[in-house]
Amino acid sequence: MAGLHDFWRGRRVLLTGHTGFKGAWAARWLHRLGAQVYGFALPADTDPSLHVLLHTPLAGEMLADLRDAQAVSTALRDAQPEIILHFAAQALVPASYRDPVGTWTSNVLGTIHLLEAMRTHPQSLTAVIVTTDKVYANNESGAAFPESAPLGGDDPYSASKAATEIAVHSWVKSFFSGRHRLATARAGNVIGGGDWSADRLIPDIVRAAQRQDSVVLRRPEATRPWQHVLDPVHGYLCYAEALHAQRPGLPDSLNFGPLDDQRITVGAIATDLTKAFGAPAWRHEPQQDIGEKGVLALDARLAAQSLGWRPRFATQAALDATVSWYRDWLSGGDAAVLTDRQIAAFEDGL
């Protein structure tokens, strides 16, 4: 754990998407590590918002849209970062059907605006561009996707993230060779306390419990690579450190996901969590299905080989930590205290 503190203490970090769920956890951890975090994001769009509840001190902040190229360029100039962690995105599959153009412009054009700002930036930069486990052409064979699997995507969100991967590859090969160090990170379905996004399983269950209503499942038989938010964030930090040190032989992309034997269906998780939160039993409404893939798994062995990264949470432990956070917060606990406690426990295991 001392190594993380030694590397990140005093580092200037531009974190996009710091007002989102994963971004709020990352900002909190980076602050604890002593980094100077500059945030760039839209205002938090959920109420409650983990970002608002945590009140994490920032070295600077710009609330703006990635689709505003001038704002992105200004943020990079003002932050003068050594390292960029790019989380900001339209990250919900259902929302991508409602606004496909907005999803594509946010995810692809927004990332290109960041890449262009980097292209004209005078100093060398290290960047981890976060995409998703859904960038792969998924034939639902059940096999876990390695990083070499073909990219694809049927729904607008998945396709936009696959296109983002191609854009990053193009800018790296065309403009950044020998100057900036970039890589993409692909993580599975992230869970943890403090997520209140719409159309996500655990936030939907928490809301249903508060209303004493049944949560509606689109595909209860679907499996996903569930993982606690601290596992992929730890992976991103390790990846950024290795890139910054110019460690030889690093892959251009890495998967961060649970062990391959940790496959649990949506229905099984919903059954356990509705009981844990005292909510009515879930119900299945097939007409709500929007064509999402039923099987999805990541092969994260390359991250273990190249970074020494491995998930610290088994899936059940990730679910237990998530339930604990929400229960304590709903009982009046302080979100910052709860979050710091879980980060500290995670650090103790490193």
Q: What residue spans do the PLM features occupy?
A:
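N-terminal Rossmann-like NAD(P)+-binding domain of SDR-like oxidoreductases, especially those catalyzing
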Residues: M1-A187, A345-F346
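Short, solvent-exposed loop/helix junctions and linker helices
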Residues: T16, L66, T105-V108, Y157, ...
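Residue-level marker for well-ordered alpha-helical positions
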Residues: A24, Q70, P203, G267-A268, ...
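C-terminal substrate-binding subdomain of Rossmann-fold SDR/epimerase-dehydratase oxidoreductases
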Residues: R32-L33, A64, A209-L350
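Residue-level detector of flexible, active-site-proximal loop/helix-junction positions
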Residues: A44, D68, K134, N189, ...
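Short, charged helix-to-loop "capping" segments that act as catalytic/coupling loops
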Residues: D45, A79, R119-T126, F175-R179, ...
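Residues in well-ordered alpha-helical elements
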Residues: A69-Q70, E82, P94, V101, ...
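NAD(P)-dependent short-chain dehydrogenase/reductase
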Residues: N139-A144, S148, P156, A162-H244, ...
